[in-house]
Amino acid sequence: MDSDDDYNGPADTNPRLEDEESDLDEKYPNRPRNHSTTLPFHVLFQTLFYPLSEIKKKPAGPARKKVGPHGLSSVNLTPLEKRRDIIDRFISRWRKEVGDDIYPAFRLILPDKDRDRAMYGMKEKAIGKLLIRIMKIDKNSEDALNLLNWKLPGQTTTSSMAGDFAGRCFGVLSKRPMRTEVGDMTIEEVNEKLDHLSAASKENQQLPILTEFYRRMNPEELMWLIRIILRQMKVGATERTFFDVFHPDAENLYSISSSLRRVCWELHDPNIRLEAEDRGITLMQCFQPQLAQFQMHSLDRMISRMRLTEDDPVFWIEEKLDGERMQLHMDSNDSVPGGRTFRFWSRKAKDYTYLYGNGIQDENGALTRYLSDAFADGVESLILDGEMITWDTEQDAIAPFGTLKTAALSEQRNPYSSTTRPLFRIFDILYLNGRDLTRYTLRDRRNALQKSIKPVYRRFEIHPYEEATGKTEIEEALRRVVEEASEGLVLKNPRSPYRLNERHDDWMKVKPEYMTEFGESLDVVVIGGYYGSGHRGGGLSSFLCGLRVDDAHSSQGMVASKCYSFCKVGGGFTAADYANIRHHTDGKWHEWKSRKPPTTYIELAGGDAQYERPDMWIKPEDSVVLCVKAASVAVSDQFRIGLTLRFPRFKKLRMDKDWKSALSVQEFLDLKANAERERKEKEFNVDNSRKKRAKRDNKKPLAIVGYSAEAEAQYTGPSGNIFEGLNFYITTDSNTPVKKSKAELEQLVKANGGKFFQTSNAAPSTICIADRRTVKAASLQKSGNVNIIRPSWILDCIRQSEIDAGLPDSLLPLEPRHVFFATQDKKEEIAASVDRFNDSYARNTTNDELKEILKQMSKDHHFHASQNPKIVRKLNERIQEKVNAGWEMPSGWLFKGLTILFPQNDKVDDAEVDETSQTHQQYRLNLARNTVRFAGANVVDSKSSSVTHIVVAPGSSSSDVSSIRKSHSAKPGKKVPHLVTAEWIEECWKQRTLLGEEGFQPSRGT
């Protein structure tokens, strides 16, 4: 049971726990009771976690050391069926040997879904420190350093599991276990101790509890216990799989209640289904909200997912807010002061009622005290979905998300002195006066919201949206987002219902930071400023920037200090940046007067129309220089250059430069020409990192994907933290894939957080680097106990860190190509990072690497891999999982599952087409056949009951079309295949998605 008290010893001595148990009996009078003691803790990983993890592993690579107990009996099952079988066996055993209350086990199996146990407040480093104390290890020893620096790769077996804290703990614990055999702790005992641990807030309270675990568990048990504490199980099965096996209504009940306890206790009998009235959301019961799908590779594809119709061809655009997702429940209650009761829950089901208030007259509520007149007459109860943000009353703008809790606490203490306050922005209503609205369309729900709420200015407001029909509106909205430094956009389908606990295409995120930046940083001069509105109101929030006019673009006699307008920059500024700009330009701004523009200093586009004219202007000689980056360069008649930056973002203020050393018009044109020679300019490209992460998951769930050839050519040495805490001894320069001197490699290490030394033993866990056999390298190799890594690993890690900007830093695992010399115990781990053709599981190969891999592959290998039905079936399942989660369909899988019939002899009516046309039509048909065959379709040339599509030859006569229609007319119980032209295949391939067949049917008149 939960407890907010400090650890006080056994649970049965705590009266509060007894009271909580009594309350639970009252709340769940029909709760199940177990007839026997719970199973031993070790049964969880022996019969559940390990077998599930074995299915998760990829069959390629070295032989597996462990085989699940059901491996032989489930050979012919799909991975999903195997997972279900393992889970079902465990649940059946529990019901037979323990009883119907499986909640104690599920709390440990799905710890991240257990909202009834408080967070432990313990991260990896805190656990590592406690283990060092418990095992009495010297804090400067190698094992202690391995625990504290668990993200770093090491040279020994103990430290080899970089990034897996629990695995590294296992290595250290195995050297000094209290017991080697599994312990005798039951699942119930473990839960009891974990309840105490979650209530312990100080290290001296946590230490005796972990010591008890250490005394009674072996290293393997402790490894899984640590994963439970960190809520990082990763056993190869999601909660949906567990719920689905446990009870057909389990996932639905969890979605509407967020309560693992309620799922286990109310659905303990799989034969009793939820009543219809129990399947919807309930007032004062936290539910799992709908989430927005991740951004796809193109706006056109995203718009297609909005399912526009001829009668209703619109979708909605909302600003994505930088706050905390929050649901508000309100119920009328005459027995409480103010007549209304409130509850607040976050997306993670954390109760925030204590912070925002439980009633109109709750003096500790940072929000509810202002809501006495916030609801329309007749509104008795409702549930609202929205975002809690921080509002800066002085700037009249959104404040950073990290200040939300501080603002709420400040509002609690003194509502009159605070400059920031919580603001609840509402974008949906899901329940109104006893009626569940989730099945209604978003448009209908919005109408209900407008009629139910009376906004309270800057405290309780309805989030606005705008209607759109195409990507032009999205691009324009993105420009505003960047200018105002907002979070991003959300596209919504107004015809959609609300989907509980689901990330669906009806809502899709668009964030400007996903976009590929124009490769160079540009130093531009501020020549104008625009007053902000909304979030950035009250001051100059965005700036007009210009390029210095040089001799090549100056008119005769023109003043040298003139600038051409080039772009508007409003994204990326912090409050400190704005203050710094104000400080250096104070008193130098002038109001822009349209009738008397300052053409001596600034030239806009449009002549007298004065395109993009600013509110204020400043002389270039009085101004500052900004360093900006952008998505790309685009043609524009809105700026004097004729070009502009798409989605520019401020990087830093260049106080080391003045307007004379800023970028000139000619310098920019030269820079653009050079960039275009290196790569073709792309419009509105989504960052490759998302696509590459999708490919990574289709191979093997290791740490990181690799770098691209393009990144290799452009790389100039970014700064980062990928090597933070690592020590390097670099003995040679780099020969491949690019030449780098020893000094350059050392500077790269330093620039990315690492340290370098000139001897191998100057610091603990030093990584030795060499690319050729020198005296130093030979000496290290001769010792036989040091791994020597090639410089290519450093370069690969840095490039990947740059690609994955914004994601947690994680080092690439070592591949054979990265290793100059490896110790015997390291060789197996290194070999496991690639397949038999040396194709990395964790890194995308470059074009040159792929060519070499293909050269090594024999035809027999190719045939074996492509024809193995188990491999194909497994690959199909994994690809489908990713596509369902929003990833782009791989090109080679586009027509997978379809059976397509092509006409025999590919004949056309000779009377209707000449020889040249017939040859072209024959070519189109052959190309269509090869395309679908490549993209996974089953191509047939004769009638079959499994045919899904029939391709009609170009130029077919009306009689041919009629004959085909007649021969494939529907029979009872059979579906009619689609008749399509070759154009359907061509367009599907072009759009990389399966299009509707309706627009590609052969004409009835042909």
Swiss-Prot record:
Residues 1-36 are annotated as: Disordered. GO terms for biological process: DNA biosynthetic process; DNA recombination; double-strand break repair via classical nonhomologous end joining; nucleotide-excision repair, DNA gap filling. One of its GO terms (molecular function) is DNA binding. NCBIfam families: dnl1. ATP binds at residues 318, 320-321, 325, 387, 427, 487, 492, 509, 511. Mg(2+) 1 binds at residue 387. Residues 718-811, 890-1002 form the BRCT domain. It is found in: Nucleus. This is DNA ligase 4. Belongs to the ATP-dependent DNA ligase family. Its cofactor is Mg(2+). It holds the Pfam family BRCT_2. PROSITE patterns: BRCT, DNA_LIGASE_A1, DNA_LIGASE_A3.
